[in-house]
Amino acid sequence: MAHRSHTGTGPSQRQLRVGELIRRTLADVLNRGEIHDPELNRLSITVGEVRCSPDLKVATVHVMPLGGKNVEEAIALLSKHRGELRHHITRQMTLKYAPDLRFRPDETFDRLDETRRLFSDETVMRDIRGGGEADED
């Protein structure tokens, strides 16, 4: 079997696959309330994306509580239970190392709102339809 290394600028297929498995595992654990903390279980947290480092030792988890409120509280609670969450991940996956979990706010929805706002702008709509005037040099 040939050994190939990933030389591209983006994440490798393995990073993407492991990140998605971690995302699904964390989402299931949080959805089922398997972490025994009433403060954490009262929050409905969405795990939007997990990005893994090339060596798969660090996983950055992008999360957002339902409604977008209490983001810092959710991240603090998840960080507090990092070890227990890692334990759930290692039970579901066979990796050489259990990845260190780092929690960050998921800004995908903010970017989506900004994109929608841009597309609703009249100048942008005119450019999309081809009605804009071409710049002449």
Curated annotation (Swiss-Prot):
Q: Which Gene3D superfamilies match?
A: 3.30.300.20
Q: Which domain of life is it from?
A: Bacteria
Q: What is this protein called?
A: Ribosome-binding factor A
Q: Name one GO biological process term.
A: maturation of SSU-rRNA
Q: Which residues form a coiled coil?
A: none
GO terms of molecular function: ribosomal small subunit binding
Describe the protein's quaternary organization and the partners it interacts with: Monomer. Binds 30S ribosomal subunits, but not 50S ribosomal subunits or 70S ribosomes.
Instruction: State where the protein is found.
Output: Cytoplasm
Keyword match Cytoplasm: yes
The organism encoding this protein is Cereibacter sphaeroides (strain ATCC 17029 / ATH 2.4.9)
Is the keyword Cytoplasm assigned to this protein? yes
The job of this chain, per UniProt, is described as: One of several proteins that assist in the late maturation steps of the functional core of the 30S ribosomal subunit. Associates with free 30S ribosomal subunits (but not with 30S subunits that are part of 70S ribosomes or polysomes). Required for efficient processing of 16S rRNA. May interact with the 5'-terminal helix region of 16S rRNA.
Cellular component aspect of the GO annotation: cytosol
Keywords of this entry: Cytoplasm, Ribosome biogenesis
Q: Which family does it belong to?
A: Belongs to the RbfA family.
Q: Tell me, in one coarse class, where this protein mainly resides.
A: cytoplasm
InterPro entries according to UniProt: KH_dom-like_a/b, RbfA, RbfA_dom_sf, Ribosome-bd_factorA_CS
